[in-house]
């Protein structure tokens, strides 16, 4: 039907207006006729479909037929009413009381009739009350087809207790048949209270009220249902049209087992029906009740198919139903066939066509007298049932597919994709791991190569270090062998009868435990040391005392001795044999300052130049308990100085001692670059041919190979030579001449080779043996001495002899010339000195003793003449011992140096001179010396007292007379250009001892310096061989100790 309803709500009232554009097609007369046809006289049975008028047992509460009611209100003399509003009588429907409210002049509007359905006594209802109802209000017309009807669905509650239309109908139209001839207006109301459900579709309308609404709203219901079905079919159609997705879905579905398919093809009814109610039932929509009734009927039809219920014969005969898709199995919906086939059927099968046939009352000009067709009503009911069933089936199929099957399919696709992603990630991870492994292997290989290179480098470095150590050890061994060879050659050369002037080294080590020979008067008288010897020789330390000896170092003054000859005596030589000598060994360390200096005498013919004197320390300052050094270390070689005197000619040869640092005590740790080079220089004298004499030595040095030590860097070397006045007349004052000598090759050229011979056994030669002088050999060797400028504790000489040595002819000498010297005495001599390279050394104990003035320290009275320094207190044949003491002097009188450090006893070994040197040439020298002593008088052997006692005990070396060739140590200082010898007083007594013995031990410190037991000076010839002894505790009576007249050495510790 084409009648439309316009609803306007305001102020709790509803008004129904007649559509002015003619949309209300059914006249009141037609409606009245249709309405009257429903109410068949005498209760004619209804012709509704079998499922429409059935209230099932499962429906709870009141049935729709019980909730439906009607009411008719007739208003008389409507035109005469001047009231604003009128209320109708109260009636009850569905358990609630209702009434009709009208506004004859309109509610908030003019020229319109306003109609409302109200809840009676709403103010008395309980709070929270509500009534959900669908109602229809109609104004009757004389022509029933022209009657005015309005339908609506509303929920009444406290604030909305009335609902209707403000503009139900215009007032002028009421005169067109709505008001009858008596002036009465009839209003009719139909109310259907709804008991809604949310879990499943439910029955809403009474069948009679539904039949009335179906004729009007059937098209709206169809439109709603087909819209939903088309939506679901289109979705399924898109899935089927997508071939790839459909193929994938088919593969997925075919891959499932039967149980999975069956389980996925079923769903609970409650789940689906809840969704159906929620989707289709909408409040404020008048057709919602009809849709819900349609779904309810369709659900009942599905359930009835499964129960094989037979419907009424007339329905079955007239209705042809389509093939079912969904079946009801107990409380579940199940797909009747395979899901693939059902999807294709639902998507491709067309829907039933809409009926073009409309109601007979739909046209405004319809015949009023036409009877209502029962068949039309039944057809509409069947159509609503089919719409409901089809909608439920599509809904169930769509729900099962969308919520179960498609979800499983999407999960499978997602799982597969996830597996692919995982596989891709694993492959990427494996590739990355492989790359990392390659990088790690590469880095590891690099590290390994680097480590191997480092290990190889360290290994090569270790090999190089071991090679260097091996080379250094071999070098040190070779140097030691060379030193031993040089030492052995020197000893062998010194002991040869025809080469009397060999010098192997400038260092003479004086050992504290060296054998000291005490000569008695008889031995000294027959000693050949008293014979004049025109030779210069420096002996190396013997093999027995090289490992213990530590000597002083002295230097050669830079000047030329202009005397006629040279004479050398060896203080350590003796004519006694080994059997008659008892050697005393001094063990232990000595505390205190020990001035172990060698008595020297220095006569200079020329003027000494102070500017060429190098400052140095002559005595090494040693600490207490200093261990002995090995003699193989060149730095431990002590250098002695000898004074040769023939008449007025005196030559001073001093040697330098380099103190040893604690780091250089072991010969193994010695730096190869600092190996001390020893060179052998020989001064060939004109000796008389005599039997060889060897000094006693506990260990005979074995000569190995002859050569000169190799030196890497040799500083400036100075060649020292002595010129004889017979060939060259030198001026009284002569400058030192420096000659720089080349390295190793030049030195080896200078050094004269000497054959190695086994020394003859030591033996004493009788004085009466005849001596045949040998032929003189021309000397060709000059001495080379090297010194380093970095020596911190060396005592350098005042100058260097600048004239080179040259050969001289041998001239026989007289006894006079042999003693006092003359111009005719031209005994050739060559000066020799050892060569040593001394590395810098700094000792903590500073001793400042240097020589600048060049004057010797002389204890006797002396004066300076043009010929040199001459003694004024005695004749030229007198021997004197000049001792220089540098002690702890508190006064500075005579400009003496102040020494504040303790000096250990320094062992000085005096070079040995071959005894046959002067004995062969002057066999009666002792007798001549005695005669000369009677003529000139004997010079006092002065024993001096220092003005201040030393801190500890000291013993002087060479305290006895030295004869013609005496030794002197010269000190020079930067600021004191005078002799220190004047500081010490003389002793006037020339013969302090009465027993004829000469004192060999000097008492120091607390000892008595009066020397009550000094030997008589008469024995002049024997005093030159005085031996030196060290500290002897039992020195009060020197004559009591000893064996067979020789002195017994006692150390200071009493052992």
From Swiss-Prot:
Disruption phenotype: No visible phenotype under normal growth conditions, but the double mutant plants traf1a and traf1b, or muse13 and muse14 are extremely dwarf when grown at room temperature. One of its GO terms (molecular function) is protein histidine kinase binding. Residues 37-46, 569-586, 723-740, 823-845 have a biased composition (Polar residues). InterPro entries: MATH/TRAF_dom, TRAF-like, TRAF1A/B. GO terms for biological process: autophagosome organization; innate immune response. Keywords: Coiled coil, Cytoplasm. SUPFAM superfamilies: TRAF domain-like (SSF49599). It is found in: Cytoplasm. CDD domains: MATH. Transmembrane segments: none annotated. Residues 441-496 form a coiled coil. Residues 447-460 have a biased composition (Basic residues). Residues 68-191 form the MATH domain. GO terms for cellular component: cytoplasm. Interacts with AHK3. Interacts with ATG6, SINAT1, SINAT2, SINAT5 and SINAT6. This is TNF receptor-associated factor homolog 1a. The lineage of its organism: Eukaryota, Viridiplantae, Streptophyta, Embryophyta, Tracheophyta.
């Amino acid at each position: 039907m084409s009648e439309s309803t316009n609803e306007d709500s305001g102020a709790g009232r509803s008004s129904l207006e007649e559509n002015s554009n003619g949309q209300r097609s059914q006249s009141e007369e037609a409606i009245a006729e249709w309405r009257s046809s429903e109410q068949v006289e005498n209760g004619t049975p209804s012709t509704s479909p079998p499922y429409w008028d059935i209230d099932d047992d499962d429906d709870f509460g009141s049935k729709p037929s019980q909730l439906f009611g009607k009411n008719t209100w007739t208003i008389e003399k409507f035109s005469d009413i001047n009231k604003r509003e009128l209320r109708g009588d109260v009636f009850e429907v569905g358990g609630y009381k209702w009434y009709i409210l009208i506004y004859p002049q309109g509610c908030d509007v003019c020229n319109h009739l306003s109609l409302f359905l109200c809840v009676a006594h709403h103010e008395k209802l309980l709070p929270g009350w509500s009534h959900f109802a669908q109602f229809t209000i109609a104004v009757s017309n004389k022509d029933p087809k022209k009657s005015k009807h309005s339908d609506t669905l509303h929920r009444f509650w406290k604030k909305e207790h009335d609902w209707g239309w403000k503009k139900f109908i215009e007032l002028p139209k009421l005169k067109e048949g709505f008001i009858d001839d008596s002036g009465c207006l009839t209003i009719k109301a139909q109310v259907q209270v709804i008991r809604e459900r949310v879990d499943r579709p439910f029955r809403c309308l009474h069948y009679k009220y539904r039949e009335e609404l179906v004729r009007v709203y059937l098209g709206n219901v169809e439109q709603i249902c087909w819209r939903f079905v088309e939506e679901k079919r289109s979705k399924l159609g898109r899935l089927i049209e997508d071939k790839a997705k459909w193929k994938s879905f088919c593969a997925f579905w075919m891959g499932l087992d039967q149980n999975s398919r069956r389980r996925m093809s079923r769903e609970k009814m409650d789940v689906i029906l809840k969704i159906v109610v929620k989707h289709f039932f909408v409040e404020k929509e008048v057709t919602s009740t009809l849709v819900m009734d349609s779904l309810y009927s369709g659900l009942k039809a599905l359930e009835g198919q499964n129960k094989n219920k037979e419907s009424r014969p007339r329905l079955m005969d007239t209705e042809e139903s389509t093939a079912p898709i969904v079946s009801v199995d107990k409380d579940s919906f199940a797909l009747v066939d395979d899901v693939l086939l059902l999807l294709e059927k639902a998507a491709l099968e067309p829907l039933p066509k809409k009926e073009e046939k409309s109601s007979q009352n739909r046209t405004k000009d319809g015949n009023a007298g036409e009877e209502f067709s029962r068949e039309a009503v039944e057809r509409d009911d069947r159509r609503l049932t089919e719409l409901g069933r089809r909608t439920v089936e599509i809904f169930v199929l769509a729900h099962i597919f969308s919520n179960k099957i498609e979800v499983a399919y999407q999960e499978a696709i997602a799982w597969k994709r996830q597996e692919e992603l995982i596989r891709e990630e694993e492959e990427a991870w494996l590739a990355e791991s492989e790359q990392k492994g390659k990088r790690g292997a590469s880095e590891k290989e690099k590290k390994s190569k680097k480590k191997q290179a480092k290990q190889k480098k360290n290994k090569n470095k270790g090999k190089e270090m071991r090679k260097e150590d091996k080379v250094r050890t071999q070098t040190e061994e070779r140097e030691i062998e060379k030193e031993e060879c040089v030492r052995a050659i020197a000893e062998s050369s010194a002991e040869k009868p025809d080469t009397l002037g060999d010098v192997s080294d400038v260092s003479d080590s004086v050992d504290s435990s060296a054998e000291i020979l005490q000569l008695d008067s008889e031995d000294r008288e027959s000693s050949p040391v008293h014979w004049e010897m025109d030779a210069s020789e420096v002996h190396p330390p013997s093999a027995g005392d090289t490992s213990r000896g530590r000597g002083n170092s002295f230097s050669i003054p830079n000047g030329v001795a202009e005397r006629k000859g040279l004479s050398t005596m060896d203080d350590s030589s003796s004519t006694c044999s080994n059997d008659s000598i008892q050697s005393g060994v001094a063990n232990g360390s000595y505390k205190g300052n020990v001035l172990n200096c060698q008595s020297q005498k220095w006569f200079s013919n020329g003027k000494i130049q102070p500017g060429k004197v190098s400052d140095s320390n002559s005595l090494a300052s040693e600490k207490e308990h200093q261990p002995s050094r090995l003699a193989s270390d060149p730095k431990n070689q002590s250098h002695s100085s000898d004074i040769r005197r023939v008449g007025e000619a005196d030559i001073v040869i001093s040697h330098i001692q380099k103190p040893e640092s604690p780091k250089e005590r072991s010969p193994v740790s010695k730096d190869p670059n600092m190996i001390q080079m020893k060179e052998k220089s020989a001064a060939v004298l004109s000796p008389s041919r005599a039997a060889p004499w060897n000094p006693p030595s506990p260990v005979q040095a074995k000569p190995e190979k002859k050569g000169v030590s190799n030196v890497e860097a040799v500083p400036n070397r100075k060649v020292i030579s002595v010129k004889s006045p017979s060939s060259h007349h030198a001026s009284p004052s002569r400058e030192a001449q420096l000659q720089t000598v080349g390295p190793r090759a030049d030195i080896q050229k200078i050094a004269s080779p000497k054959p190695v011979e086994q020394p003859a056994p030591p033996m004493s030669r009788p004085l009466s043996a005849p001596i045949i002088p040998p032929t003189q050999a021309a000397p060709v060797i000059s001495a080379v001495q090297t010194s380093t400028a970095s020596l911190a504790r060396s005592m350098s000489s005042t100058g260097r002899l600048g004239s080179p040595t040259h050969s001289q002819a041998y001239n026989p000498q007289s006894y006079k010339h042999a003693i006092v010297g003359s111009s005719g005495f031209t005994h050739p001599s060559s000066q020799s000195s050892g060569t040593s390279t001394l590395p810098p050394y700094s000792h903590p104990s500073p001793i400042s003793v240097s020589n600048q003035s060049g004057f010797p320290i002389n204890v006797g009275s002396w004066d300076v003449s043009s010929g040199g320094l001459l003694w004024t207190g005695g004749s030229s044949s007198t021997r004197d011992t000049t001792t220089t003491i540098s002690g702890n002097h508190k006064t500075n009188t005579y400009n003496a140096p102040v020494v504040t450090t303790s000096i250990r006893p320094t062992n000085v070994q005096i070079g040995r001179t071959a005894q046959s040197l002067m004995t062969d040439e002057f066999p009666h020298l002792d007798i001549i010396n005695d005669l000369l002593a009677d003529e000139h008088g004997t010079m006092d052997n002065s024993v001096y007292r220092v003005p201040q006692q030393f801190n500890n005990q000291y013993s002087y070396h060479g305290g006895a007379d030295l004869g013609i060739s005496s030794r002197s140590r010269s000190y020079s200082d930067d600021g004191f250009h005078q002799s220190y010898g004047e500081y010490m007083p003389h002793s006037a007594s020339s013969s302090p001892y009465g027993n004829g013995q000469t004192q060999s031990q000097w008492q120091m410190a607390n000892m008595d310096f009066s020397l009550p037991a000094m030997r008589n000076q008469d024995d002049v010839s024997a005093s030159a061989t005085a031996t030196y002894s060290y500290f002897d505790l039992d020195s009060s009576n020197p004559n009591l100790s000893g064996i067979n007249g020789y002195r017994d050495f006692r150390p200071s510790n009493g052992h």
